[in-house]
Swiss-Prot record:
It is an enzyme of class 1 (oxidoreductase). Belongs to the pyridoxamine 5'-phosphate oxidase family. This is Pyridoxine/pyridoxamine 5'-phosphate oxidase. One of its GO terms (molecular function) is FMN binding. One of its GO terms (biological process) is pyridoxine biosynthetic process. HAMAP family: PdxH (MF_01629). It catalyses: pyridoxamine 5'-phosphate + O2 + H2O = pyridoxal 5'-phosphate + H2O2 + NH4(+); pyridoxine 5'-phosphate + O2 = pyridoxal 5'-phosphate + H2O2. Substrate binds at residues 64, 121, 125, 189-191.
Length: 212
């Protein structure tokens, strides 16, 4: 590693994040930094679930909101992720911000957002994306791209004028954290890691520093 790289990392870690006591506040700080430094989708997160056989699944989704109740994303209820979350409402998230040499891991319980929340968010989506949500049978076999484009055209014709309502099979989920882990790269793999954990959302956080 060059002296320049080491100096850059030293600048990134000039504030001791391991002194933080509130994981949500620390996430907010890091996410604000990511919004300034990441070129593409700082709200992108890996979502891990398991199927009924216990086989893990992971995919990238976009976080559409967060607060102390949890982290929210949206998709089709009948999708692979939707079916897996219905069978086992627990999940893990990973945010990786390469430009900052940071990552945040989150594990917790999953619950559905309210109908009002889903409606309100769906109304903010571009109309073409709303139409796509109606046309797509996410995770189901697709005969051809042409078949999908035909389905899109039919939905577009149906909603040529006026607002597009939210499909009944499209909604969102909230992951309420029971565990956070904040990781920051250091020179020579001597990284900093801290974990916040609790058994239930009503309990206070327990902070632990971890070996890299």
């Amino acid at each position: 590693m060059s002296d320049t790289s080491i100096q850059q990392q030293s600048q990134l870690t000039s504030g001791d994040f391991t002194a933080a006591e509130n994981p949500f506040a620390l996430f907010a700080e890091w996410f604000a930094d990511a919004n300034e430094s990441e070129l593409n989708d700082p709200n992108a997160m890996a979502l891990a679930t398991v199927d009924p056989d216990g086989l893990p699944d992971v995919r990238m989704v976009l976080m559409k909101g967060y607060d102390t109740d949890g982290f929210v994303f949206y998709s089709h209820i009948a999708s692979q992720k939707g079916r897996e979350l219905a069978a086992n409402p627990k999940a893990a998230l990973l945010f990786h911000w390469k430009s900052l040499r940071r990552q945040v891991r989150i594990r917790g319980a999953v619950s559905a957002v309210t109908e009002t929340e889903a409606d309100d968010y769906f109304a903010t989506r571009p109309k073409q994306a709303q139409i796509g949500a109606w046309a797509s049978k996410q995770s189901q076999p697709l005969e051809s791209r042409f078949a999908f484009e035909q389905a899109i055209a039919k939905v577009a014709a149906r909603y040529l004028v006026g607002e597009v309502p939210r499909p009944p099979g499209w909604s969102g989920w909230r992951i309420t954290p029971l565990r956070f882990e904040f990781w920051h790269d250091r020179p020579f793999r001597l990284h900093d890691r801290i974990e916040f954990s609790r058994d239930t959302p009503a309990q206070p956080w327990i902070k632990t520093r971890l070996y890299p």
